[in-house]
Amino acid sequence: MEDFMKNALKEKLNQGKSVFGTFIMTSGLDTAEILSYTGVDCIMIDGEHGSMSLETAGRMVSLIKNTKTTPLLRVPSNEISLVKRGLDTGTAGLMIPMINTKEDAERAVQYCKYPPMGVRGMGAGRAVLFGAPADEIKDYYAKANDEVLIIVQIEHYLAVENIDEILSVPGIDIAFVGPMDMSTSMGLTGQLNHPDVQNNCRKVIESCRKNNVVP
């Protein structure tokens, strides 16, 4: 179970190394498997905008875990049931969209962490090898709070206004900027090179550096 729980992506990030990843939005299992052999560090399974079901996403997680690539999953929204079920796929990290306030961030972390740090429920899903053997389940519960990456998505001008408060929440590992939604929230849809959009992106990066969060 030790190797099963080890998060190679988080280890690289903690060492200050750059990582390279990609998104998958289609439901083809072969596509996910092929991508995992291309040398990327991680694959983000897009459960927000992608066409795959949660069942298919779970199968993708399993396929990717059989390679040197780390599987990640983006859930549709910051809701406890979606976060819990997403984590039960066994993903090494979860991206949660539209985190606009400190309270949003606190809820996201709470949903991702087991007690006493959070409210994640203990189920016998893929993450714990479907409940057997008991010693390994205990090991997963003990390590998951530290090993599973929590990625908050910053994609609205309100999030930028609150960025220092958001990233001060303990437990956040990565802040991922969504520039298209950011530009739309500012009334500048698609103008990703507009100075105001670029300035907001810079503010997020600066706050990440202050709060020891990976941008």
Predicted segment positions?
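Histidine/lysine/aspartate-rich catalytic loop segments that bind and position anionic ligands
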Residues: 169-194
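Short, glycine/acidic-enriched loop or turn micro-motifs at the edges of active sites
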Residues: 49, 158, 181
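Non-catalytic positions within long, well-ordered alpha-helices that form the structural scaffold/packing
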Residues: 36-37, 87, 167-168
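N-terminal amphipathic alpha-helix/helix-capping segment at the start of soluble metabolic enzymes
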Residues: 1-21, 134-146, 202-210
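Conserved anion-binding
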Residues: 81, 93-170
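Conserved N-terminal beta1-alpha1 strand-loop-helix module at the mouth
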Residues: 1-71, 77-78, 110, 150, ...
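Alpha-helix-loop-beta-strand connector modules within alpha/beta enzyme cores
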Residues: 54-88, 112-117, 142-145, 192-215
